Amino acid sequence: MSKNFAESLGWEVGVDFPEWGNTEEYVKTISRGYLINDEKPKDAYLRVAKAAAYRLNRPELANKFYEYIWNNWLGLATPVLANMGTDRGLPISCFGVDIGDSIHDIGMKNLETMLLAKHGGGVGIGLNMLRPAGSPISNSNGTTDGVVPFCKIYDSTILATSQGNVRRGAASVNLSIEHGDFWEWIEIREPKGDVNRQCLNLNQSVIISDKFMRKLEDGDDESRRRWSKVLQKRKATGQPYIMYRGNVNKQNPEMYRHNGLKVFMTNICSEITLYTDESHSFVCCLSSLNLAKYDEWKDTDVVYYSTFFLDGVLEEFIQKAKNMRGFENSVRSAEKGRALG
């Protein structure tokens, strides 16, 4: 790295930022939105570590958390580093909202999506409960126009929502491959056709059931056409992401099985498998252990105490968000499930 670049910020390697971060990419990235006022990386790491320990009522853990971060054993998710221990944003990476089949719920979930994205999280949006185009509308002689116009609403919401100067909001729309609107929905990211039905700012996740896979194996023509379209789109664009709902629910934790809870959708990255419904929106509380440093930490207590760290992150989210309008579903889910990842 150009030594002058760090020095121009008044940073000394090994003192103000770690030696493993002595690259131009590190310095430019962390100084672009992650630091508050005149913070240096060391100050930011201490801020995060102390905040997590405070939320746990375990101040003695702050130095341990700081050591993990400084050593690059524990890698912080973007919202954790940017927002933990501050009065801005929330320390949560992403959320999942499930939309009920009513205009009221569609509108309320749009408000929820806007607020979640604004405060630092990507949002997975479940569309499976919505009726397909042509379905009758209650108390009306009309029929619904399907899921795509509502995707357009969420597309515009994400385009209009930013997360300060850290990153723009992001969202994915989840739909079952068996849904009646699949054929139009699978094309919404293509810049062609009716501009009012294009959703160029959304990601897509397609949900696959065991029932569909059995029909596919049995040679059902419509199932094969749909599966072929998914594969063609993935080859061309890398999307839609795929979630095998049957496999997920077979591996549900005991608490889910005991209470009859099923997973119907996922987040943008398709790695979160938590329960959602109209009144529960999942919370994705993340950080990472650095496998490149595995030989350094494999015989330490980093895994054990990193779990405590994440619990402190989740507690900060709950305490910050429980009095914020639009976060009721997420707080309810966090308090009940206490999911960490």
List the model feature ranges, each with a label.
Residues 1-341:
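Extended catalytic cores of very large enzyme megasubunits
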